C-alpha cells in the first residue's frame, strides 16, 4: 500500500507527507524499494541489470546513468562483481544488487521486504552491515520482517502487527523492557535451591539440574538471591537473570505461538 502496489481498503496512508495514492508521483522518486526475492536477468551482468532497470525509470537522467550505476554498485560492495553474470551471484549478492537498484537515485526512504530471508549466515551479515551503513548515511529504512532476532540487531524502532493491526510500537528498548525477568540457576542441589527461592517469595520450577523462575522488579535483588543460596550451602554452577527476548515479547503481544490465529 505504501508503494501503491495494493489498493487501500480503508483509512488514510501518507508517504513522506504525501497522501497515498494521490501523492505517489511526488513521493515515489524519493523512495527505493526491495521486494522479497528481487528478480534479475540471469544472463546479464549485475551492472547491465542496473543499466536496464535505470533505463526504465522515466525520472532517471541518461547522461549520468553510467556514473550512478557504478556508484550504487560501490555502495553495496559489488564493484568487483559488477561484470559477473547474475546467475553466478550468491543470494546475498543478489540482495545487495537489489538494494543497489533501489539506490540508483538519491533516496530519503528505503522500503525493504524480508531483506535477509533465506540467506546463509555470511549473506545475512553482508546485508545487515549494508543496512547499518546506509542508515548511518542518514537514509530512513523501513523493514518488513518476521526474523525478530535480525530486527533486534538492525532496527532502532519497531511496530508489531497482528491480524492487520498495530498492537505495539516504540523503540526496541521500550518494547523489550519488562518488569519481569527470567531467573535461571544451575545447581546439583535443586530441592535446596527451590526452598531458598520459596523462602524469598519466588516460585521456581526445575528441569534436571536447572532451576527457573520469574523475578519481578519488586522482588529481592538477584545479588541477594546468590548470597542467600551460598549461605544455605547451595552449590551454584551458573546463575543468570535475563529480560524476555523480542520474540517472547512478540508472542505475549500477539498471542501467536504454535496455535496461530486463524
Segments predicted by a language model, with ranges:
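Short, charged/small-residue-rich alpha-helical element at the C-terminal edge
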Residues: 180-253
Amino acid at each position: 500500500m505504501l508503494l501503491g502496489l495494493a489498493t487501500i481498503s480503508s483509512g488514510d496512508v501518507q508517504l513522506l507527507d504525501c497522501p497515498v495514492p494521490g501523492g505517489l508521483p511526488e513521493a515515489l522518486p524519493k523512495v527505493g524499494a526491495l521486494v522479497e526475492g528481487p528478480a534479475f536477468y540471469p544472463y546479464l551482468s549485475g551492472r547491465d541489470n542496473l543499466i536496464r532497470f535505470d533505463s526504465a525509470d522515466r525520472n532517471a537522467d541518461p547522461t549520468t546513468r553510467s556514473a550512478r550505476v557504478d556508484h550504487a554498485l560501490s555502495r553495496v560492495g559489488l564493484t568487483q562483481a559488477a561484470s559477473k553474470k547474475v546467475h553466478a551471484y550468491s543470494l546475498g549478492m543478489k540482495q545487495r544488487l537489489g538494494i543497489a537498484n533501489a539506490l540508483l537515485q538519491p533516496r530519503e526512504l528505503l522500503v525493504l521486504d524480508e531483506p535477509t530471508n533465506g540467506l546463509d549466515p555470511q549473506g545475512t551479515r553482508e546485508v545487515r552491515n549494508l543496512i547499518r551503513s546506509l542508515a548511518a548515511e542518514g537514509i530512513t529504512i523501513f523493514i518488513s520482517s518476521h526474523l525478530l532476532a535480525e530486527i533486534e540487531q538492525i532496527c532502532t524502532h519497531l511496530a508489531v502487527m497482528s491480524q492487520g493491526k498495530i498492537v505495539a510500537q516504540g523503540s526496541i528498548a521500550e518494547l523489550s523492557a519488562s518488569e519481569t525477568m527470567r531467573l535461571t540457576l544451575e545447581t546439583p542441589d535443586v530441592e535446596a535451591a527451590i526452598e531458598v527461592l520459596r523462602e524469598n517469595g519466588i516460585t521456581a520450577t526445575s528441569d534436571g539440574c536447572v532451576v527457573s523462575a520469574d523475578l519481578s522488579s519488586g522482588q529481592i535483588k538477584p545479588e541477594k538471591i546468590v548470597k542467600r543460596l551460598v549461605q544455605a550451602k547451595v552449590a551454584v554452577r551458573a546463575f543468570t537473570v535475563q529480560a524476555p527476548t523480542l520474540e517472547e515479547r512478540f508472542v505475549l503481544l500477539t498471542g501467536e505461538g504454535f496455535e496461530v490465529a486463524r
